[in-house]
Swiss-Prot record:
The gene is ligA. The active site is at K112 (n6-amp-lysine intermediate). InterPro entries: BRCT_dom, BRCT_dom_sf, DisA/LigA_HHH, DNA_ligase, DNA_ligase_AS, DNA_ligase_CS, DNAligase_adenylation, DNAligase_N. Pfam families: BRCT, DNA_ligase_aden, DNA_ligase_OB, DNA_ligase_ZBD, HHH_2, HHH_5, Nlig-Ia. Belongs to the NAD-dependent DNA ligase family. LigA subfamily. GO terms for biological process: DNA repair; DNA replication. This is DNA ligase. It comes from Staphylococcus epidermidis (strain ATCC 12228 / FDA PCI 1200). Residues 586-665 form the BRCT domain.
Length: 665
């Protein structure tokens, strides 16, 4: 057991270090696959030895059991909002008021992150509770969801007791990925990253929150008793040293002119950031001066938030263009008369779905208001009705697919229209583009334009055809010289060696992402083994939900898919997992790797002693009987678990049979 404990401690240290490098320093020293491998190893050990699982284990990052509601908790100190400034005049008045009160002053300027304010409590250096701002006096306990954010340390270097506050946010890249996924699934996308972050942190199921890839910037310490800082800048530096993520774009300035210069700089540069900001926060830097100035009932007197003006422009909606994704979702896009918004020229904007078009009564030919939602995606806010042409008509989505002509359907519970024709050209092309992408088969040089040419020239119809391409097929294509063709054929040949998880992701199975592809590949090791899997078996696996289990089984049972896999195999495309399996604790073959449930009263030992002994033999001891349970050991007065085992046909041992097995070792 001492060896297991040491390994758990080592895994904690490694995973925390790698997480800090990736999510806080943005400078990873190992690939994602190495982190995932170690995390899977720790998950397996904790399942066999739950006594070694702690609240600060890196495994809590993946989420836990769903909650029924969030508990309301009073803040130890109210989370006040900041007063607002909207222009230079407001800022100069603020500065004058400060100087009239305390004389000479130095300011700390910080980016105002557009997210959800949170408060994190640490006791003896461990993260124990996280709350939303709520009404400022009472917030909601979202601790389990906050534990899934890798930028929040679960344990810090020093055994300190304090509360740190900050802003949880969704990076732009995560937001775009999430909305693409929602649209592919026919769901209503989020309007902006702030809404997405807030919605993610209010998920009752922390496993869903974990998938949303949130981050956090910390900006203040509520109780500095155990800190040495005398200024805001020093407090942030101490947080840096403790392993917290603070925003590094902050700047200390000596007067209001420095504040105005900082605002001017970030007004023009904010589009270059990987996250949204909606303004600048200006604070008196000296903490003793902050204390001297104090607070009003609503906000601190020593700080103010400058809000960026919302940039909206008017342009003309020329047309509505439809695109079909690889899952058949039909997405309308506004084609606009080009116009500058927030420093960039905009000629297209997403309209998401027909419901949104009707809700906002947007029509072709309208003069429309455009804004850049969260600095990312241009959004059509509304039509200007008094400029509407007399001949305008209410827009209706087509009843048939614009690519293949198949009838469009709206699946119950979805807002999107979907083409369900498996032979739809637009879907097939999008599927081919997905198959060759970096996270799938990673075929360098096989871009969108070449795929379109190959498809239009009937050289490829499915993903397997890629591996049947020859030099004479490629040379006649536009901009394809001999050297380029040779490199492409080499890349195609190299891709055949990709591990099974890349192939699974590349096939485009609905709901199957990168992470779940890795889980399935590692667990089942070969495509042949996956063909045998059942829906009930998949549901038992962590990270695999009901929808995904059904989707995978339905996909793999399809005879056309079986033929496609065979076609790939005939060209020696790898069908096996090539990664390193997570380590297993060796034990007796009668028990090692088996899922065992103990029920009823044992006479020769306690159930806890039996459980510990089984784990030492490599068994996984669980509390509930499922179809994947291998053995149920039943003592006296065994109840519903025994009945369930009989129903499933699970192997049942009496205590005597169990003792006999023990004695035989």
């Amino acid at each position: 057991m001492q060896d297991v404990k040491k390994r758990v401690e080592k895994l904690h240290d490694l995973l925390n270090q790698y997480s800090y490098e990736y999510y806080v320093q943005d400078n990873p020293s190992v690939p994602d696959s190495e982190y995932d491998k170690l995390l899977h190893e720790l998950i397996e050990i904790e399942e066999k030895y739950p006594e070694f699982k702690s609240t600060d284990s890196p495994t809590v990052r993946v989420g836990g059991e769903a909650q029924s509601s969030f508990e309301k908790v009073n803040h130890d100190t109210p989370m006040l909002s900041l007063g607002n400034a909207f222009n230079e005049e407001d800022l100069r008045k603020f500065d004058q008021r400060i100087r009239d009160s305390i004389g000479k002053v130095e300011y700390m300027c910080e980016l105002k992150i557009d997210g959800l304010a949170v408060s994190l409590k640490y006791e003896n250096g461990r993260f124990v509770q996280g709350l939303t701002r709520g009404d400022g006096t009472t917030g909601e306990d979202i601790t389990e969801n906050l534990r899934t954010i890798h930028a929040i340390p679960l344990k810090i270097k020093e055994p300190l007791n304090f509360e740190v506050r900050g802003e949880a946010y969704m990076p732009r890249r995560s937001f775009i990925h999430l909305n693409n996924e929602k649209e592919q699934n026919g769901e209503q996308p989020f309007a902006n990253p702030r809404n997405a972050a807030a919605g993610s942190l209010r998920q009752l199921d922390s496993k869903l929150a974990a998938k949303r890839k949130l981050s956090v910037f910390l900006y203040s310490v509520n109780d500095l008793t155990e800190f040495n800082a005398t200024t805001q800048s020093e407090a942030l530096e101490e947080l840096d040293q403790l392993g917290f993520k603070t925003n590094q774009e902050r700047e200390r300035v000596s007067d209001i002119e420095g504040v105005l210069n900082y605002i001017e700089k970030w007004t023009s540069k904010r589009g270059s950031l990987s996250y949204d900001i909606d303004g600048i926060v200006i604070k008196v830097n000296d903490l003793s001066q902050q204390e001297e100035m104090g607070y009003t009932q609503k906000s601190p007197r020593w700080a103010i938030a400058y809000k960026f003006p919302a940039e909206e422009v008017i342009t003309k909606l020329l047309d509505i263009e439809l695109s079909i994704g690889r899952t058949g979702v039909v997405t309308p896009t506004a084609i606009l008369e080009p116009v500058k918004v927030a420093g960039t020229t905009v000629s297209r904007a997403s309209l998401h779905n027909e419901d949104l078009i009707h809700e906002r009564d947007i029509r072709i030919g309208d003069s429309v208001v455009i804004k850049k939602a969260g600095d990312i995606i241009p959004e059509v806010v509304k039509s200007i009705l008094d400029r509407r042409p007399n001949e305008s008509e209410i827009y209706h989505m087509p009843t048939h697919c614009p690519s293949c002509g198949h009838e469009l359907v709206r699946i119950e519970g979805e807002v999107a229209l979907r083409c369900i024709n498996p032979k739809c050209q637009a879907q097939l092309i999008e599927g081919l583009i997905h198959f060759v992408s970096r996270q799938a088969m990673n075929i360098d040089g096989l871009g969108t334009k070449i795929i379109h040419q190959l498809y239009e020239n009937q050289l490829i119809k499915d993903v397997a055809d890629i591996f049947y391409l020859k030099e004479e097929d490629l040379l006649p294509l536009e901009r394809m010289g001999k050297k380029k063709v040779d490199n492409l054929l080499l890349a195609i040949e190299k891709s055949k060696e990709q591990s099974l998880e890349h192939l699974l992701f590349g096939l485009g199975i609905r709901h199957l992402g990168v992470k779940a592809s890795q889980v399935l590949a590692e667990r089942y090791e070969t495509m042949d083994q996956l063909f045998k899997v059942t829906e009930s078996e998949l549901i038992e696996i962590q990270d695999i939900g009901d929808k995904l289990a059904q989707s995978v089984v339905t996909y793999l049972e399809n005879s056309d898919i079986r033929s496609l896999i065979e076609k790939l195999s005939n060209k020696n495309v790898n069908m096996s997992y090539k990664g390193i399996k997570t380590t297993e604790i060796e034990g007796h073959p009668d028990f090692s790797g088996k899922t065992i449930v103990l029920t009823g009263k044992l006479e020769q030992m306690t159930r806890n002693e039996a459980s510990e002994w089984l784990k030492m033999q490599g068994a996984k001891v669980t509390s509930s009987v499922t179809k994947s349970t291998d053995i149920v050991i039943a003592g006296a007065d065994a109840g519903s678990k025994l009945a369930k085992a009989e129903k499933y046909g699970t192997e049942i041992w009496t205590e005597a049979a169990f003792i006999e097995k023990q004695n035989g070792i």
